[in-house]
Amino acid sequence: MSAAAVVWLSMLGALVVNIQPMFLGAISEVYGFDAAQLGFISGAELGGGCIASLLALYWFPRLNLSKLISVALVVSVVGNLVTPMATTYTSLLIVRFCTALFGTGVLYAIILGVIGQMQNREKLFASAIILQVVSVAVFMLLTPELISEGSMTGVTRLMAALMASGFYAKNYLVIVSHRASDHAASKSLGLLLWGLPGLALLGLVAFDVGISSIWAFVERLGAEAGLSMDDSGLALAAGSGIGVLGAFFAAYLGMRWGRLKPFTASILGLLIACLMFMEASTWFSYMLAVGLLNLFWNFALPYLLGSIALFDKTGRLMVLIPAAQSAGFAIGPMVAGLFIVGADYRVSALVAFVAFVCCAAIVLPMLLKMKNSPVGQK
């Protein structure tokens, strides 16, 4: 039951990141914000999660994690209920930032730290991704109907209800006690900042810059291809359904092929997806591009996260994963939003292409070195 609780809570912690396309699309439809404003709203929330994760380096080995989960869930519920009341750009920016900083960001950091202490981490990551993809598909289908009356209330109430379900899952969560002295914790922090651990996290940042550059604006890319929001939602749901196969395949394959081959194949697939987004002009071509993006995103991620987990079995390194992911997901929409001219959202796919090339340049040599000289494996 503890594994199931971890998987469910990880879905809640990553929910806003995963449903960004329809969440930002809903904000655009309801409030009429432009691409740059949407990028900074996304960046503010993800930046809050990044800060929460960085602060977790201090409190993860020191504080009562069970109580912190409860506080984070309360903030997440309240933040989503308050969101429809924030009707201006600035107020919405502040509400979403605080919700991430004290709510979902804290929750996600704790859960990934807990996964770092458990066995079969690649399979846990893959299972968590499968559930996250299911949540994406649900929101893709429901969001157009939930905002049909010109309000964000339906979307945020659903998000709040899901966050509240975390209190039930928390009852089955087993957290290993790992209190550490200030000296030991500081020493661990110093070790994290140098060598392969830092390189792996930098690669994760570049990977998520690429993903988020497209993902934040993928609904808008559908609109540019001539699709209505309903049609885009159906294509995104279908594409997400294709994408879940990547996580299933990663869970089935495990370490049979190591990490280098699956990750290399994933980067090549993601580059092809970027090119397809640039040329998408029909529902089918758009859906196929979304499917490839999700397929190789979900296939690559368990191996990338698993390589990071090799370096630390206490969970302290793992709490930095949300910071790296949040940084990437915050930077991606901001950079893409600044380069988008008018309604030409295809620029976001070009930004993603460059980011994936940078990710490959960082991660592939690291994985090759780990293959030749296994690090942290037992």
Regions found by a protein language model. Name each.
Residues 52-65, 246-259, 340:
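Helix-to-loop junctions at the C-terminal end of transmembrane segments
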Residues 91-106, 205, 285-299:
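Hydrophobic core of transmembrane alpha-helices in multi-pass small-molecule transporters
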Residues 142-147, 155, 159-182, 362-367:
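C-terminal membrane-cytosol helix-exit motif in multi-pass small-molecule transporters
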